[in-house]
A protein has these predicted regions:
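Nucleotide and nucleotide-moiety/phosphate-recognizing core
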Residues: 2-108, 112-136
């Protein structure tokens, strides 16, 4: 089963006052904490891919070396400013083009989500052949 992990890094941070995804936390941007864990997870599973969906050029630029290394892919989603449904849609459309059997959505503003929790969720999705799962 081909699972695409959709990493939703496109929020508007209206209440936060600035882009919370880029806010420094424990030595790196908030969005990088869970992303780095998900990249490790995807690297251990042959049929799992990591796809970052964002409306931010800076995130695309920062992730370019990881894209080049084949660790993840990115999708630019300018419509994400309209809401999370546009971000999810952009991710699912990209996953469909890659012939994914399932999509698992993770929000980038969850820096403390444990690697083992995320991996168990994904393994459970795969075992149940669930076409869509979300961790928000």
């Amino acid at each position: 089963m081909r699972v695409t992990i959709l990493y939703l890094a496109a929020g508007n941070s209206r209440r936060f006052g600035e882009n919370k995804l880029l806010y420094p936390l424990d030595g790196k941007a908030v969005y990088r904490h869970l992303l780095d864990r998900l990249a490790q997870i995807a690297g251990r599973h042959e049929n799992w891919e990591l796809l970052v969906v964002t409306q931010y050029e800076r995130i695309l630029e920062e992730l370019a070396p990881l894209v080049k290394a084949g660790r993840l892919q990115t999708v630019f989603s300018p419509d994400s400013e309209k809401g999370i449904s546009y971000t999810i849609r952009a991710g699912i459309e990209a996953a469909e083009k890659q012939n994914a059997d399932a999509c698992a959505c993770f929000a980038a503003d969850q820096p403390y989500l444990k690697e083992e929790t995320a991996e168990r969720f994904l393994e459970s999705m795969e075992m149940q052949k669930a076409p869509l799962g979300c961790v928000f």
